[in-house]
Amino acid sequence: MAFSYGFFNAKNLDRVYTAEDFTSYLSSLICNGILDTYGDNFLVTASGNLSVVIGTGKAWIGGHYFINDMAYTLDLRQYVDESLSRYVTIGISCDVSDSVRACKLEVKSGTAATSPSVPAFENTDTKTYLTLASVRLNGGITSISQSNIKDYRSDEKKCGYVKCILGKCKVSEILAALDSYNKTVTELNNRVAEFQERLAEV
């Protein structure tokens, strides 16, 4: 399975989760965004034709998670106009309305024009978005290049990365800080041991 999500209230047992699902949930953090320590962080890349590839990743939206555990190819040929250009925006949505209760990948199409604008996802009381990227589809295009793709993952107003509980650093940053701290402690312990050896020789 490429995608999974959770957790939502069940109706007639239509939403069932395992212990593994729950532990995966607990291993994530609170702030909305992409977990920067999992997979490819949903990187959107050109595939050489009219498709793009969504890399593996894990997102956190309002206490719900969305996982892509294998590369996912998204065909955009239906959005190509013969003569005019348009943008499409790719994102992850979390819909908590009773009729949906799910997270999924979404594409929002802009209007074809001589000077097209980038369509934006709009959050509502029941639906929240993380915008991954926008893709410019020039009129009559036969393949998408990487230069046609704009990455929004680091834009905290549109997406952003999951941060630690204090909301001041990404997971990878706090892990790097801990690694640096451990190296410093090890170095200090070595110096203390060396000093004690010298004292013993006196």
Stretches with model-predicted labels:
Residues M1-F42:
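N-terminal alpha-helical "arm" segments
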Residues A2-R15, S51-L199:
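Beta-strand-rich solenoidal segments
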Residues L29, G33, T37-Y38, S47, ...:
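Compositionally biased, intrinsically disordered low-complexity segments
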Residues L43, N49-S51:
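Conserved P-loop NTPase/AAA+ ATPase motor core
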